[in-house]
């Protein structure tokens, strides 16, 4: 700042504060100067005299400033730049590195979460406590949610953790999308969303690992029906009805999947039924889970002795049973039978809830019929297949809800 000849060079408090508070390329000087008087054009602004805001050191500068000076002087171009500037717009959310592998033979989708870099700080210390969670879309729920461990106080976490979906079919690969979300864990309040990536599974080829290193994106919430215009609501309803019509009236609601193992033992003269595991079961309890168990019947059951059931698995939608049941029967007789498998939610003091079921036998269709036929044609060979559970309750099974 220039003064009269012989005067000591001084810097007023406004300039001193502006210098200290304006580091880096963020350039907030324009915003800070709104609260301090600025030297305007004219004779006061140049030469040897003091202008507005250049007060003696023993006086408060703001007290001498006129109201107009407190508002600051910005050009239209400057004002437009400030209005359009948003620090979040230029803040990277970070990148996520991971591998995906679809194992067609075992019907599994493997997702190895490797690392993230440059995550957005979420905590007061400028760091985050990140973890990754997976969902399959459409139909995101607790049944298909997988989650990594939390890495503490880092913006560059390394997980190297593998998460696996079971019971994935070729139809899932064609139609479903994997949503990978990175969140910040907060023990004192709700966890915070950082960013996400959505990968259509059709980009995967069976048994070929695919590597990804992608920038995270913001979550784009879909508009609620109440916020849509009448025209958009009408179009949405029309498309939904059209989709239901294309699917057909006979389509049953999917309630999860079950992995069954069938083997006819020629030495023991009977059928071995293995209940291996279930995946993505429907939640039947208020806590968002179920307490599932499995029952099997071999119909027609003249002696009513064909019922078997597994133990109950508490609070899970992806139970592992690994239990085996044996039905003593000649192969020729077995060819006329139907194996009914139902999954139930165990409740104390009231009727158990039916989750879903599947029937395997000569009258079945699709994969269920093929599984039964392969079992009969390949004695002494265990044949494992995943089956979709539907909401159709077998007539005979409905009479035993408490068992």
UniProtKB/Swiss-Prot annotation:
Domain of life per record: Eukaryota
Record's keyword terms, sorted: Calcium, Calcium/phospholipid-binding, Cytoplasmic vesicle, Exocytosis, Lysosome, Membrane, Metal-binding, Repeat, Synapse, Synaptosome
Tissue distribution of the protein: Predominantly expressed in brain. Also found in non-neural tissues. Expressed in RBL-2H3 mast cell line.
Pfam families: C2
Membrane-related topology note: Peripheral membrane protein
InterPro entries in UniProt: C2_dom, C2_domain_sf, Doc2, Rabphilin/DOC2/Noc2, Rabphilin_Doc2_C2A, Synaptotagmin
UniProt region (Interaction with UNC13D and DYNLT1), positions on chain: 1-92
Organism field: Rattus norvegicus (Rat)
GO BP, one annotated term: synaptic vesicle exocytosis
Protein name: Double C2-like domain-containing protein alpha
SMART domains registered for this protein in UniProt: C2
C2 domain: residues covered: 92-214, 254-387
Function comment: Calcium sensor which most probably regulates fusion of vesicles with membranes. Binds calcium and phospholipids. May be involved in calcium dependent neurotransmitter release through the interaction with UNC13A. May be involved in calcium-dependent spontaneous release of neurotransmitter in absence of action potentials in neuronal cells. Regulates Ca(2+)-dependent secretory lysosome exocytosis in mast cells.
UniProt subunit comment: Interacts (via N-terminus) with UNC13A. Interacts with cytoplasmic dynein light chain DYNLT1. Interacts with UNC13D.
Residues reported to bind Ca(2+) 2: 285, 291, 345, 347
Region of interest (Interaction with UNC13D), ranges: 218-403
Cofactor annotation: Ca(2+)
Main localization category: membrane
Keyword Membrane found: yes
GO molecular function: calcium-dependent phospholipid binding; metal ion binding
Subcellular location: Cytoplasmic vesicle, Secretory vesicle, Synaptic vesicle membrane; Synapse, Synaptosome; Lysosome
One Gene Ontology cellular component annotation held by this UniProt entry: extrinsic component of synaptic vesicle membrane
Binding site for Ca(2+) 1: 123, 129, 184, 186
Annotated positions binding Ca(2+) 3: 285, 345, 347, 353
Comment field on protein domains: C2 domain 1 is involved in binding calcium and phospholipids.
């Amino acid at each position: 700042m220039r003064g009269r000849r012989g005067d000591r060079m001084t810097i007023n408090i406004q300039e001193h504060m502006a210098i200290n508070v304006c580091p880096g390329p963020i350039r907030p000087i324009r915003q800070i100067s709104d609260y301090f008087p600025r030297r305007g054009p004219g004779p006061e602004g140049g030469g040897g005299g003091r202008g507005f805001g250049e007060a003696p050191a023993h006086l408060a500068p703001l007290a001498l400033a006129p109201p107009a000076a407190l508002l600051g002087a910005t050009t239209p171009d400057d004002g437009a730049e400030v209005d359009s500037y948003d620090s979040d717009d230029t803040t990277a959310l970070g990148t996520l590195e991971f591998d995906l592998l679809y194992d067609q033979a075992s019907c599994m989708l493997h997702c190895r979460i490797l690392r993230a870099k440059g995550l957005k700080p979420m905590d007061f210390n400028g760091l985050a406590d990140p973890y990754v969670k997976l969902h399959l879309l459409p139909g995101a729920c607790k049944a298909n949610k997988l989650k990594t461990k939390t890495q503490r106080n880092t913006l560059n976490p390394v997980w190297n953790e593998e998460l696996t979906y079971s019971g994935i079919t070729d139809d899932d690969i064609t139609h479903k999308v994997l949503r990978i979300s990175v969140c910040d864990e907060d023990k004192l309040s709700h966890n915070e969303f950082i960013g996400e990536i959505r990968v259509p599974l059709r980009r995967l080829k069976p048994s070929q690992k695919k590597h990804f290193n992608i920038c995270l994106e913001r979550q784009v919430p879909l508009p609620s029906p109440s916020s849509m215009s009448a025209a958009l609501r009408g179009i949405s309803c029309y498309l939904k009805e059209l989709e239901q019509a294309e699917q057909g009236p006979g389509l049953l609601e999917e309630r999860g999947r079950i992995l069954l193992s069938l083997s006819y033992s020629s030495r023991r003269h009977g059928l071995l039924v293995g209940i291996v595991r279930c995946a993505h079961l429907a939640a039947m309890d208020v806590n968002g889970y179920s307490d599932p168990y499995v029952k099997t019947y071999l119909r027609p059951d003249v002696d009513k002795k064909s019922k078997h059931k597994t133990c109950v698995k508490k609070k899970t939608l992806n139970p592992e049973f690994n239990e085996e049941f044996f039905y003593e029967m000649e192969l020729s007789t077995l060819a006329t039978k139907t194996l009914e498998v139902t999954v139930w939610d165990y409740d104390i003091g009231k009727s158990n809830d039916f989750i879903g079921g599947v029937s395997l036998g000569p009258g079945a269709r699709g994969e269920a019929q093929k599984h039964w036929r392969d079992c009969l044609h390949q004695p002494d060979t265990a044949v494992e297949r995943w089956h979709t559970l539907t909401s159709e309750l077998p007539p005979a099974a409905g009479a035993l809800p408490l068992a």
